[in-house]
Amino acid sequence: MGEVAKEEVEERRSIVAVNPQPSKGLVSSAVDLIEKAVVYLFHDKSKPCHYLSGNFAPVVDETPPCPDLPVRGHLPECLNGEFVRVGPNPKFMPVAGYHWFDGDGMIHGMRIKDGKATYASRYVKTSRLKQEEYFEGPKFMKIGDLKGFFGLFMVQMQLLRAKLKVIDVSYGVGTGNTALIYHHGKLLALSEADKPYVVKVLEDGDLQTLGLLDYDKRLSHSFTAHPKVDPFTDEMFTFGYAHTPPYVTYRVISKDGVMRDPVPITIPASVMMHDFAITENYSIFMDLPLYFQPKEMVKGGKLIFSFDATKKARFGVLPRYAKDDSLIRWFELPNCFIFHNANAWEEGDEVVLITCRLENPDLDMVNGAVKEKLENFKNELYEMRFNMKTGAASQKQLSVSAVDFPRINESYTTRKQRYVYGTILDNITKVKGIIKFDLHAEPEAGKKKLEVGGNVQGIFDLGPGRYGSEAVFVPRERGIKSEEDDGYLIFFVHDENTGKSEVNVIDAKTMSAEPVAVVELPNRVPYGFHAFFVNEEQLQWQQTDV
């Protein structure tokens, strides 16, 4: 067998076709009746569900490719490719509770080629979604259900359905709604409770779910929504967290897509570990006190994840090719939580982490009828340093609230970079602007709000009633030989005044208030999570075997 043929066989083996085998019938109907009775008795449906209304509400249908969209301005040549953003879009209304993290993953994609734009939106065809389509209704528990005794009951309902083979959990139960990344010829849709789903971008910009990626059965645990690709080695670094030991498992995936042996990371308890970071020689794990506490859920009527403000924040720095965690160095900093890191690198004896640091997180803030608020919500850009020689740790505040979704020119991942691009939050879930930080400049003392000056080099304000999403940096030229900020920021925008959505492109160097391009979209695009840009070269190199 020739080398090309061997490679094609390997690719076919690595993508798993998802064909769950749920079961309708008397057993399924009986379980449904029990659930309906308990929901009727114990769930308060009178409270409106904020995250199913307004522009959080799901769109009813997928959108096949809509070509030749109206473009104001021009789309630069470096944007030839597919801009994609994923987010929650529940296909079926929930039986009871609903948390913003619960919805089925829908990818909104814009194919750009030769100055023209095509829009499409498609569900990530997860095992969970396929089964609920089969039943024509929800059958899997939701984060929004997991409070109090009612939460315990909903957990038991899912376990019962699985035991009776009403639902098939053999392919996982994730939604694919959180983030996207490209590695070894594959665009991956991610949610941290599941394995990656492979999504193919078709020539016309359409999106097709090919199946699950289990790395030839070497991946048996969950997979973070925020793996890291080293642009200098083309390797991908990832981990999964669990509610039973080992609570964290670290993995390295070669540039050829081969997953190496698991490395269990020892931490004292089950925590939510949403992100991590890599440098040239290290991986950084974050043991932060947002604990998985089912007992507290039942006793205190709390959400199943609860934050302990009395505990320190711990950061573990591990040589990134370590065979076990015996060489990990743990550092402590004041109590906090972190959803998203920007980058990390090494300076002498120190490992430097640039991150968005959050105080007193409460996942209930984006749950059910709870409207988003900014009171007591402190999410700020920070620099953290870990001295590998002395064991000392320090941190420095780089901004006031509220900043999130930090992105960089990803050609600099693992290396020291100068600029960070983030979103300015009007409230917990709405983005009112895009901000550019210069890490070579000092923050202005005494600032009470985010404004240009000091280390804030530019702000793109979306205007009243207009809200955006994570902005992705696209360089004019890939690599680190050109100017770091020579490129564009691309992101989705929704105008609540008109009900219309669009894609904006702005100049990352100047942060001019005048967009380089505005692409008018045919449909509303709900607020969502993370975005990614697949360049033309990556599109042409997609591994397409099923």
Curated annotation (Swiss-Prot):
GO terms for molecular function: carotenoid dioxygenase activity; metal ion binding. GO terms for biological process: carotene catabolic process. In vegetative and floral tissues. Signal peptide: none annotated. It catalyses: all-trans-zeaxanthin + 2 O2 = 4,9-dimethyldodeca-2,4,6,8,10-pentaenedial + 2 (3R)-hydroxy-beta-ionone. Disulfide bonds: none annotated. One of its GO terms (cellular component) is chloroplast stroma. Its EC number is 1.14.99.n4. Fe cation binds at residues 226, 274, 340, 530. Induction: Constitutively expressed at low level in all tissues. Its cofactor is Fe(2+). Belongs to the carotenoid oxygenase family. Cleaves a variety of carotenoids symmetrically at both the 9-10 and 9'-10' double bonds. Catalyzes the formation of 4,9-dimethyldodeca-2,4,6,8,10-pentaene-1,12-dialdehyde and probably hydroxydihydro-beta-ionone from zeaxanthin. This is Carotenoid 9,10(9',10')-cleavage dioxygenase. It comes from Crocus sativus (Saffron).
